[in-house]
Amino acid sequence: MGARASVLTGGKLDQWEKIYLRPGGKKKYMMKHLVWASRELERFACNPGLMDTAEGCAQLLRQLEPALKTGSEGLRSLFNTLAVLYCVHNNIKVQNTQEALEKLREKMKAEQKEPEPEQAAGAAAAPESSISRNYPLVQNAQGQMVHQPLSPRTLNAWVKVVEEKAFNPEVIPMFMALSEGATPQDLNTMLNTVGGHQAAMQMLKEVINEEAAEWDRGHPVHMGPIPPGQVREPRGSDIAGTTSTLAEQVAWMTANPPVPVGDIYRRWIVLGLNKIVRMYSPASILDIKQGPKETFRDYVDRFYKTLRAEQATQEVKNWMTETLLVQNANPDCKNILRALGPGASLEEMMTACQGVGGPAHKARVLAEAMTQAQTATSVFMQRGNFKGIRKTIKCFNCGKEGHLARNCKAPRKKGCWKCGQEGHQMKDCRSGERQFFREGLASLQREARKFPPDNNKERANSPSNRELWVSGGEDHTGDREGRKGEDRELSVPTLNFPQITLWQRPILTVKIGGEIKEALLDTGADDTVIEEIQLEGKWKPKMIGGIGGFIKVKQYDNVIIEIQGKKAVGTVLVGPTPVNIIGRNFLTQIGCTLNFPISPIETIPVKLKPGMDGPRVKQWPLTEEKIKALTEICTEMEKEGKISRIGPENPYNTPIFAIKKKDSTKWRKLVDFRELNKRTQDFWEVQLGIPHPAGLKKKKSVTVLDVGDAYFSCPLDENFRKYTAFTIPSVNNETPGIRYQYNVLPQGWKGSPAIFQSTMTKILEPFRKNNPELVIYQYMDDLYVGSDLEITQHREAVERLRSHLLTWGFTTPDKKHQKEPPFLWMGYELHPDKWTVQTIQLPEKDTWTVNDIQQLVGKLNWASQIYPGIKVKQLCKLIRGAKALTEVVTLTREAELELAENREILKEPVHGAYYNPDKELIAEIQKQGQGQWTYQIYQDLHKNLKTGKYAKMRSTHTNDIRQLTEVVQKVALESIVIWGKTPKFRLPVQKEVWETWWTEYWQATWIPDWEFVNTPPLVKLWYQLETEPISGAETYYVDGAANRETKLGKAGFVTDRGRQKVTSISETTNQQAELQAVLMALQDAGQEVNIVTDSQYVLGIIHSQPDKSESELVNQIIEELIKKERIYLSWVPAHKGIGGNEQIDKLVSTGIRKVLFLDGIDKAQEEHERYHSNWKAMASDFNLPPIVAKEIVASCDKCQLKGEAIHGQINCSPGVWQLDCTHLEGKIILVAVHVASGYLEAEVIPAETGQETAYFILKLAGRWPVKVIHTDNGSNFTSATVKAACWWANIQQEFGIPYNPQSQGAVESMNKELKKIIGQIRDQAEHLKTAVQMAVFIHNFKRKGGIGGYTAGERIIDIIATDIQTTKLQTQILKVQNFRVYYRDSREPTWKGPAKLLWKGEGAVVIQDNGDIKVVPRRKAKIIRDYGKQMAGDGCVASGQDESQDME
């Protein structure tokens, strides 16, 4: 492809590079345009080699021209490029692309006027112009139309389009362009090449079948034979190419008159592609809205792209364009578009909205005003760009020459851009001269405002209130004295200063050399530049870098400028500037500064949880000294703007109290935000853990900073502040309490950490980009700054960081600014080449409480990350169970020994190394015994990066290899978090042992790289189970049973050799009895044994090959297993009549299991234990008397708490469902109830969003006929996504009454029922989502009651089946009523009627005649359709009508 760059050489290449892309533009054609064109030609299935000659270019242009109307912008650009190349080959001189296209059109017209003789002859031979001249049908030398197969390039281009565009709207015009003139066979070839998209092709196939059937209905086949020489008429399947040959297709397309089967088939395919595009691009045109920061051009692009995918008529699309395009624009653009008036063209809209980007436009202005650069940023232009005469351009917005409206710096104007009036467009303007709507601002209306006395507080409250201050000036309001001596926060000037808010451009009226002008105060500009002003004195010529390049200006020195009553003398430049600018050379003289409140950061919006209100917790009494301390603290906080006083209109309250700080006489204010935290929305933690020093790279220079008053520097959402209200009471209720609310993030509120972290990240992001040489670790208010710079450069960079943070209101106190090692950071101690944890002192105590042990274990866990060998298992055993914090515990001998060992380990300081990315990570694991493990991660031997321990027993019964795999997983995860990769493992286990375990028992696919290290004690499997029965060994059938009430049980075995043994046990359970039976069998058996059990519990324990357990009984079984040479364990289902199992079952059940004279009781009890079915379901399924079934429910400890659920039914339509979200265990459960039947669908969803809810609704609609859904007014249910899903599935959505649970009665009661069932079976499932599905199953199929005594599952099926039958019957009735009956009475021979047919049977019909219902034999009745009023009698229709032809 690169060879295409040599299309032009020598002089022609020079000529090519002199041609402009656009008239009046700056860019010219370059070599890269030729390379691009050759690649595009390959995409459009054309030969790039044709570009080398003029004739080739002409062929390509003829090929591409028919597709221009439907083609994309890329196709037009390619055509334009080839047109210019054609002119260069033919030495036609052109200046730009437009001229090349005009020359090409002239040449084509000339060729049409003077056709060549051969062309004329060809035209005479084939006069019909409708025949396709494009491929694949071409005319041979004899004048016949022959088929030319599609080229591989065309097919390749089509495949690329589908793969790259993935069925977005652009696929349709590309298909039209590539399939021009194709036959149905060619079109099928194109479709077959993208057969991988089976779903799309199936949809396309369905559309084609429907269109083919419609064609057949509209074009019936003519009867009789086809005349000789005439082609048969195509059927729908012929057009689709399935039942027609290529020759027939060509004949139809070239006949006279032609039948364009190719074009018809293309239309069908386009209909199908429209449907596919709609599916693959599900965004509705209603959802396309302009973002607040989105440019109008991008919004229009998205709008029309989505509009192309909409399946609607052109009239509807026109209406969408006229209404929705303006309606869904952002407020800034909407104002401009409405000012243009109705009927404005898209071009006028695009022109008017150039450069407008909502808040982005404001942000650009703000950024411009905040720029503090010391030197001007000049934009230099290439000198070559001044060659030649260029057409001058004029701005629509300000009327000045030299720039376009989108680059205009002047304020954007509303209304007509010619006269300034609103209500008409510029094209309709009748005014002759321009008037600019900003002229009214020339007077001094923009008077400086004064702050109210408490404005300091207000500025802290509103982070959006950024101000430009002019210091020390006279106030135009007349109050020249001002307020002196008042306290100022963050060096804010005295309150009589004028202010100019920066939410609009700071344009003021100024006096320059006696003339009044409007000018922009620009703190980012060095110089002051004014346009069209006559100043006295001499001037010097000067060139400055301005907007759009260099501009020539006149420099006047010692000019007097008056701004807001302040005078200054300096240099003024006069020249063609788009907007008058007052630069820093004058602003610094008058003391103009940029000032910020506490935080210029945008607040993050916060809401309460749906349906909840703020906290209303009463303030508890406080002592006098605490009230005094809180009053002082709050007074200081109010001065600083962190809190504000509020009145009685705020109904919310949170209690506060005070505690003394550690080792201090000062008090600390605490707010009990527990109730507010429950009611506040959930937040996503921005940072999932704390950074670890082992992951730090070694740096030459390091600094540690701390952000002071971190939370109090971040503003709280204004709408949320009222919920943080608190009250300081008075002693003996002497006066009403003083009420405050927070303006900043409060300590103890659940949202503060996440919002602060997010805010700090946004603030540091630009600094990180501008200073890539610095590594900044940020966790809450701790900052680690490292670099490889020299110490002086590093400290300069740190000072820049501190200044950057201060700009945003974050201070970094000197007392916590650590410049020299060791650095104390995040509980660690950092040295230049090593790290350790901060010094740990273990307390010496005679008596230990639970709280003491908890703190001790916390310290040891912290130390274990660098001190290898730390153990805490025995200490943790001391505080198992629910114990009070102050309860005294006695150290066991093992715990004392463990603590003594840990003290010894901590005596010698241990240090960790820093991470080197160039070296390999190695993790070594050792077994310490008693289920405890230790590990080290290092790169160089004896220089650990990090150490750790592991002592978890994830299951009651485990073995060393399972624990080792858990340690490996923990270390791998830890390594990924800290270093982003997994280490190579060195494990104390032999390859054979490890591989045996992994292949036989471990269900996992990921195995890390590891090698064997011979570090005793080695891990091994102590016994192994056989996978097949052992021939010749005795087989033991084991079983156990226990009575729940008496706790008495039996365990025993029966062998295949006739031996048996049964033992009675006290204080046992079924599971313990089953284990006891296995132990008895193992103790009785020889070295080889087969054991058969019916207990999945026993099978699960022994199959996991444990070598240790917390159960003494299981430990005894393990000892017996180790003694055996070979063991085979098998499971059989209970109560299925299996010989040995049934025999032992009867033996151990005697006198243990209850017998209530009915065989089904055991099964019912077993089912109830599993599903907690209600008594009606058990009585029905197991044929139990109601009293017995109720006794089973009553004896269940989980079902007797709240009694039996009351079932009732609401008489509703079969298609009505109620949906609601409920919460359990911190998770969200979306519940749907079929109101008529009580049938339940529920699912745990990851988030309460519209997307998840819509997906659930679509799944529900795919399973059941859903006509109406009834929901509350939650944000997820009212979202556009849910509305779109309901629209697509044709579901009507209804909403309940806000905060009224009765309007959602069915689903609300079902929420309680579902939670109750989950509570009964929760211990059977590990995850909540499993428990939810189990509870749904139980409710739908294991609980009977309500209408019909059905389960909910049976009831919904019955209701739907009945509804279908009723509908069908109703249809039949309506069909029957379309007939009329003429009948004869037995006594009279004349025909009577017509009567209304009510029912038609085999031997008689039921009719209604004049209100009387009669039964008439079929032989005396004639049934006919109701064709209107007929006369009965001789020769009437009734006498000759055959009913069998009219009615089935």
Curated annotation (Swiss-Prot):
UniProt short sequence motif Tryptophan repeat motif, positions renumbered to this chain: 994-1010
CCHC-type zinc finger span: 393-410, 414-431
Start and end residues of each stretch annotated as Disordered: 107-129, 446-490
Cofactor(s) required, per the database record: Mg(2+)
The Reverse transcriptase domain, residue ranges: 640-830
Positions with a binding annotation for Mg(2+) 2: D1039, E1074, D1094, D1145
Keyword Cell cycle: no
UniProt cross-references to Pfam families, sorted A to Z: Gag_p17, Gag_p24, Gag_p24_C, IN_DBD_C, Integrase_Zn, RNase_H, rve, RVP
Residues binding Mg(2+) 3, per UniProt: D1220, D1272
GO cellular component term of the entry, any: host cell
Activity regulation annotation text: The viral protease is inhibited by many synthetic protease inhibitors (PIs), such as amprenavir, atazanavir, indinavir, loprinavir, nelfinavir, ritonavir and saquinavir. RT can be inhibited either by nucleoside RT inhibitors (NRTIs) or by non nucleoside RT inhibitors (NNRTIs). NRTIs act as chain terminators, whereas NNRTIs inhibit DNA polymerization by binding a small hydrophobic pocket near the RT active site and inducing an allosteric change in this region.
Active site location: D522 (for protease activity)
Gene Ontology terms: biological process: DNA integration; DNA recombination; establishment of integrated proviral latency; proteolysis; symbiont entry into host cell; symbiont-mediated suppression of host gene expression; viral genome integration into host DNA; viral penetration into host nucleus
RT 'primer grip' as annotated region, ranges: 823-831
Biased composition (Basic and acidic residues): 107-116, 446-460, 473-490
Gene3D superfamilies: 1.10.10.200, 1.10.1200.30, 3.30.70.270, Acid Proteases (2.40.70.10), HIV Type 1 Reverse Transcriptase, subunit A, domain 1 (3.10.10.10), Human Immunodeficiency Virus Type 1 Capsid Protein (1.10.375.10), Immunodeficiency lentiviruses, gag gene matrix protein p17 (1.10.150.90), Integrase, C-terminal domain superfamily, retroviral (2.30.30.10)
Domain RNase H type-1: 1030-1153
Residues flagged as site, Essential for RT p66/p51 heterodimerization: W997, W1010
MF term (GO), any: zinc ion binding
UniProt modification remark: Specific enzymatic cleavages by the viral protease yield mature proteins. The protease is released by autocatalytic cleavage. The polyprotein is cleaved during and after budding, this process is termed maturation. Proteolytic cleavage of p66 RT removes the RNase H domain to yield the p51 RT subunit.
Purpose of the protein: Gag-Pol polyprotein and Gag polyprotein may regulate their own translation, by the binding genomic RNA in the 5'-UTR. At low concentration, Gag-Pol and Gag would promote translation, whereas at high concentration, the polyproteins encapsidate genomic RNA and then shut off translation. Matrix protein p17 has two main functions: in infected cell, it targets Gag and Gag-pol polyproteins to the plasma membrane via a multipartite membrane-binding signal, that includes its myristointegration complex. The myristoylation signal and the NLS exert conflicting influences its subcellular localization. The key regulation of these motifs might be phosphorylation of a portion of MA molecules on the C-terminal tyrosine at the time of virus maturation, by virion-associated cellular tyrosine kinase. Implicated in the release from host cell mediated by Vpu.
Note: The reverse transcriptase is an error-prone enzyme that lacks a proof-reading function. High mutations rate is a direct consequence of this characteristic. RT also displays frequent template switching leading to high recombination rate. Recombination mostly occurs between homologous regions of the two copackaged RNA genomes. If these two RNA molecules derive from different viral strains, reverse transcription will give rise to highly recombinated proviral DNAs.
Protein name: Gag-Pol polyprotein
